[in-house]
A protein has these predicted regions:
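N-terminal secretory signal peptides that target proteins for export/translocation
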Residues: 1-26
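Bacterial N-terminal signal peptides
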Residues: 29-40
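N-terminal acidic, glycine/proline-rich low-complexity segments
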Residues: 47-441, 447-454, 458-468, 483
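Solvent-exposed segments in extracellular or luminal domains encompassing
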Residues: 476-492
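Short, solvent-exposed loop/turn segments at the edges of extracellular beta-sandwich modules
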Residues: 502-509
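Extracellular and select intracellular beta-sandwich modules with Ser/Thr-enriched
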Residues: 509-516
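Extracellular interdomain linker/stem segments of modular secreted and single-pass surface proteins
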Residues: 519-527
């Protein structure tokens, strides 16, 4: 995240930008190497193309968590290009629902939230750039298929939502589209059906190659059908991590409500405690958008954990220096998944699985587990939720800061620091070549904070994201300058190092990240050529 305030600018940051010629799309890395090898640095993506395109499908009106998720999304939408907000059906909102309200689509709820966004937009512009206009957002709201599942697709059944998806894919824009499926996927299925009906197989493959789909919970039978019919599609299916922003809920071994690591203190460890946190940081005194951010409560029943399952799927797009939509196994705020697709990872919903069995085999990227130590408690956590939980403290701080931006002047709010890697202040993920046994020296000393806050540095090895099974020692891991010691047995593997820069601020400690991907040469390589 690179946030440049519109009325206050850090002078050191300006000087750094000037001296670096606004390094975007490349970097010059000066590494101290103890052998004759000089490692070279290459950004994975140029900064101009690092902004992702995004279309969100959601069953608005099913329950209040959809409105929570989308209000939260709107205070982050300057970080990606939002090209569609499509109201769709799913398992819980469909014509067959018992409750009349849940039998029809509710795109008007998108408009309600955009109206709130419009009122706080002038203040948001004081804190960061690239906010879309409210009228533009209204123009990309539409309805998808009105019926449930793959049965409501086929010739002559196109919808405004399916046509919007095709129009986005037809744009002269080489960037892929991150499609968030926060309910059923039949509107996306209809778009693909319509395109296949009038195009060659090669053209269909080219269109499918532009899609990156994150399916939240497999909430209808269309996802498996799409993956079976279009086997080259890049499709992430999350049955667990998608719920890890505030959950997963349920009960632990002591029969208590279990919500993962508690970063909403001093409020109670419960869903109600989370909502007390939301009342403090979102719903009260944070402008028109916060005022319409609802509680996740069903009628007069129990309050459930905040934001349900639809926040994690889009949240990774906020950190371009950490998250790569083409690399599901690398991890980030949207979780971590298998590098290769796996066969028949079924929906978590028992009533959907029988339909999926009829179209099997199909292949998707499924979630994988991490091991992480909670820095607040020292508790070691392992499991499928951990690839999201490990970022939770930073994600919650980001939410606090951004809802503050809705009402506060620049000098009363906090803003994200800018992490620099060897002088490069872009948003790019970086790649290095190295040899086994190398010592690589990194420097984050050019990192800045727009508020002049003290910066705290952390360099760490994200073991699960790479292919080297051992540990990588980082000397000076809590300093601006650090040395990474590439193990002698790491030949032919990939190592992921994370630079995490956070500010010291009483409002909330915000973070910026840079991922450094080190490709280690094989020991038997006849000649090692650095990346040019």
């Amino acid at each position: 995240m690179k946030h440049n305030g519109m009325n206050v600018m850090n002078s050191n940051h300006e000087k750094t930008d000037a001296s670096q010629g606004r390094l975007r799309g490349r970097c010059s890395v000066h590494l101290v190497i103890l052998s004759l090898f000089l490692a070279a640095c290459l950004p994975v993506a140029a900064a101009d193309s690092a902004r992702s395109r995004c279309i969100i499908l959601a069953d608005m009106g099913n329950e209040p968590d959809e409105e929570q998720q989308m209000a939260h999304m709107l205070v982050n939408c300057n970080e990606f290009d939002l090209e569609g907000l499509i109201a769709v059906t799913g398992k819980f909102l469909r014509p067959e629902s018992k409750e009349e309200y849940r039998r029809v689509l509710h795109p008007e709820l998108f408009h309600k939230l955009i109206d709130g966004y419009a009122k706080v937009l002038p203040n948001l512009k004081l804190h960061a750039k690239h906010w879309p206009g409210a009228d533009y957002l209204r123009s990309v709201v539409c309805e998808g298929q009105k019926g449930y599942g793959i049965a409501d697709t086929g010739p002559g059944k196109s919808s405004p939502g399916s046509r919007l998806i095709l129009a986005a894919l037809a744009k002269d824009d080489p960037r892929p589209i991150w499609v968030v499926v926060n309910a059923g996927a039949n509107t996306l299925a209809q778009a693909l059906i319509d395109y296949r009906a009038s195009h060659t197989a090669a053209e269909v493959d080219a269109l499918v190659a532009k899609l990156r789909v994150f399916e939240n919970g497999a909430q209808d039978n269309s996802g498996a059908w799409i993956c079976a019919q279009f086997p080259k599609i890049r499709w992430i299916r999350s049955n667990y991590q998608t719920y890890a922003y505030g959950g997963p809920g349920g009960r632990d071994g002591n029969k208590r409500e279990y919500l993962g690591p508690n970063f909403w203190q001093p409020h109670p460890y419960s869903s109600a405690g989370q909502h007390a946190w939301l009342k403090e940081h979102v719903q009260t005194g944070h402008g028109a958008l916060g005022e319409i951010y609802p509680d996740r409560q069903f009628g007069k029943g129990k309050i459930e954990f905040m934001e349900g399952g639809g926040t994690v799927p889009w949240l990774g797009l906020v950190n371009k220096g950490l998250f790569d939509i083409d690399q599901p196994s690398w991890g980030g705020w949207s979780g971590r998944f298998t590098a290769e697709k796996v066969k028949n990872f079924w929906s978590r919903h028992a009533d959907i699985k029988p339909d999926e069995e009829k179209v099997a085999p199909f292949h998707v990227h499924r979630e994988v587990s991490d091991v992480w130590t909670n820095p607040e408690t020292g508790e070691v956590l392992h499991g499928d939720y951990v690839p999201v939980w490990r970022w939770r403290l930073a994600m919650y701080a980001n939410q606090i800061a951004r809802f503050d931006w809705c009402v506060k002047p620049f000098n009363e709010a906090n803003h994200h620091p800018v992490a620099a890697f060897n002088g490069d202040t872009s948003d790019s993920i970086l790649r290095l070549n190295a040899k086994p046994g190398e010592k690589l020296t990194f420097d984050a000393g050019a990192s800045t904070d727009p508020d002049g806050d003290k910066l705290i540095f952390a360099w760490w090895h994200y073991q699960e994201a790479g292919t080297y099974a051992g540990r990588v020692f980082v000397e000076g891991a809590d300093s601006a300058k650090a040395n990474a010691h590439i193990p002698s047995g790491a030949g032919g593997t990939q190592i992921h190092l994370i630079l995490e820069v956070r500010d010291e601020n009483p409002i909330a400690s915000l973070r910026d990240y840079r991922r450094v991907v080190v490709d280690v040469a094989s020991l038997d390589a006849a000649q090692f050529t650095p990346i040019k």
